[in-house]
Design a protein with these regions (language model features):
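Glycine/tryptophan-enriched, flexible segments
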Residues: 1-122
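Acidic/polar loop patches that form or flank catalytic/metal-binding clefts of enzymes
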Residues: 43, 106, 163, 180-185
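Contiguous, well-ordered alpha-helical segments that form the cores/surfaces of helical PPI scaffolds
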Residues: 58-61, 133, 137, 146-156, ...
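Secondary-structure transition/capping motifs at alpha-helix termini
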Residues: 81-86, 158-161, 179-181
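Alpha-helical scaffolds flanking conserved acidic
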Residues: 89-95, 164-168, 183, 187
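Active-site core of glycosidic bond-cleaving carbohydrate-active enzymes
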Residues: 97-99, 105-147, 153, 163-167
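Secretory-pathway/luminal and periplasmic proteins that interact with or process carbohydrate-rich
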Residues: 104-109, 177-182, 194
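Single conserved hydrophobic/aromatic residue that forms the stacking wall/gate
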Residues: 191-201
Length: 201
């Protein structure tokens, strides 16, 4: 590379957590290649499973979020891979989710208030308990519910859990702990590797 990195960035790279996916374009391509060569064949079967999804999912979200590769590059690579004909269902599952990514990004572009306001404005008036102790227990993985706590601790340690488990964390936060979703989303953005806002708390 013809340009040197600033010292501040080099310092941050040295402290990059070892349990996280390795950063950069070369690793983005490695994840794509290993998905198409082997990992992706069980994608459809493992997508919802907390443990198996760590291997069988595309794991492309950090590379897409940080701009290491584009949606188009990922889509074309998977669609044109020789194994596509052997694992069409699984590969099409990933391609569909790449399309969804574009769909939801466009929704945010069209209606950027989604980040801070309820889609259904009626929910803005809904009362929540939003108990600080419950919120803190959820954030630290100490709710007492094994799957919830395991997912939160895994997310904090590795920066990644599958979509279904992320959705489950938010559902528990809102419906079972009776907390306003706005009190939880920032925490998730701080610890998920795909979020450009991520900082080590």
């Amino acid at each position: 590379h013809p340009y040197s990195l600033p010292n501040s960035m080099l310092k941050e790279l040295k402290s990059y957590p070892i349990a996280f996916q390795k950063a950069g374009e070369s690793y983005a391509w490695k994840y794509l290649e290993t998905f198409c060569e082997d990992r992706g064949k069980l994608y459809s079967r493992h997508i919802s499973k907390p443990t198996e999804s760590r291997k069988s999912c595309g794991r492309l979200s950090p590379y897409l979020a940080w701009g290491n590769i584009s949606i188009r590059q990922a889509f074309q690579f998977v669609k044109n891979h020789p194994n596509y004909v052997h694992h069409k269902r699984a590969f099409n599952g990933l391609l569909t989710r790449l399309k969804w990514h574009c769909h939801f990004i466009q929704k945010f572009e069209n209606e950027c208030t989604y980040e801070t306001q309820c889609v259904n404005k009626g929910f803005e008036l809904m009362p929540y308990e939003s108990d600080y102790e419950k919120i803190n227990a959820w954030k630290t993985g100490l709710t007492g519910w094994p799957l919830v706590d395991a997912c939160m601790r895994c997310l904090k340690e590795t920066g990644w859990i599958n979509f279904r488990m992320r959705a489950m964390l938010v559902s528990v936060f809102c419906h079972h702990l009776d907390c306003n979703w706005k009190d939880g989303v920032y925490h998730l953005s701080l610890i998920h590797i795909s979020e450009p806002t991520r900082r080590d708390p």
